[in-house]
Amino acid sequence: MKKNLGQVFTDKWLVNLILDFSGYTDNHILDKKIIEPSCGDGAFLLEIVKRYIDSALSKNWSIQQIKEGLENHIYAIEIDKKYYKEAILKLNKLLEKYQITGVKWNILNEDALKIHQYNGQMDFVIGNP
């Protein structure tokens, strides 16, 4: 579905397919940094966070360890303030299911083309093709 600013929102099945093909699966993600440079309302982020939490829980991580992992390994950028806020709301709602609160998300409300602070620091750069 296409919106203003040329935004294209990704269906969940395609999100999962892209994450699977990229290798962002199971035990290979807890020490990896990932960024979604145009996160929209959070389609990729929601699945990324879910996979991260599920992987951490399978390794018996504490809630505090998971929270720190989310804050230090998952990044995103969204230019549209409406979708930036919506993505954060959806992520916090997802966290409620896991009884995790107070995550300080590394999500910027900026133009990804003008952000260079993450260059060369990420293991995965994921987004709508």
Task: Write out the residue ranges for each language-model feature.
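SAM-dependent methyltransferase catalytic region
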Residues: 1-129
